[in-house]
Amino acid sequence: MTTDQGIHEHIAALVAEEKSLRDQLASAQITPDDEHARLKALEIQLDQAWDLLRQRRALRETGGSPDDAAERPASVVESYLE
């Protein structure tokens, strides 16, 4: 997942899993508690992936190497103001 394409693919996989969870809940294959817990984890992973893409773009735009970007911890990414 060290390229923009790889990050986008990871995001797509997370979104697909999110949809699958909602479908599983609708068909009573999982409990609402299970869905909620997994969705929260997916949201954090998505926030981290989008943050990494933004870092890479910012580095590229300022003459830096996008490879210097690093995934930030959930505690950092989740404390950003929208």
Task: Give residue ranges: language-model regions.
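Extended, charge-rich alpha-helical interface modules
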Residues: 1-82
